Amino acid sequence: MSDDTFSRIQSIVEEQLGVESSKIKLETDFQKDLGADSLDVVELIMAFEEEFDINVNDDAAGDIKTVQQVLEYIEAESAK
């Protein structure tokens, strides 16, 4: 895992959802732990796409629930 990638994800989540970065861990679930609704998650996905210059397809977007899943997806896409 890249600490830089995690830090960038953390910053996006902090900015988009208005939560403290200390609450954002790998196992953090956007909806259950941070109170995000489905629109918040869509906006997060769009912010990740822009920040990391990736495209998250609809199937993958529906499966992304935690910070760990975002990180793994970004790393897999970046390796292509």
From Swiss-Prot:
Residues 3-78 form the Carrier domain. Gene3D superfamilies: ACP-like. InterPro entries: ACP (IPR003231), ACP-like_sf (IPR036736), PP-bd_ACP (IPR009081), Ppantetheine_attach_site (IPR006162). It comes from the Eukaryota. It is found in: Plastid, Chloroplast. The modification O-(pantetheine 4'-phosphoryl)serine is found at residue 38. Pfam families: PP-binding. Keywords: Chloroplast, Fatty acid biosynthesis, Fatty acid metabolism, Lipid biosynthesis, Lipid metabolism, Phosphopantetheine, Phosphoprotein, Plastid. Disulfide bonds: none annotated. 4'-phosphopantetheine is transferred from CoA to a specific serine of apo-ACP by AcpS. This modification is essential for activity because fatty acids are bound in thioester linkage to the sulfhydryl of the prosthetic group. Pathway: Lipid metabolism; fatty acid biosynthesis. GO terms for molecular function: acyl binding; acyl carrier activity. GO terms for cellular component: chloroplast. SUPFAM superfamilies: ACP-like. PANTHER family: ACYL CARRIER PROTEIN, CARRIER DOMAIN-CONTAINING PROTEIN. Belongs to the acyl carrier protein (ACP) family. Carrier of the growing fatty acid chain in fatty acid biosynthesis. This is Acyl carrier protein. It comes from Trieres chinensis. The lineage of its organism: Eukaryota, Sar, Stramenopiles, Ochrophyta, Bacillariophyta.
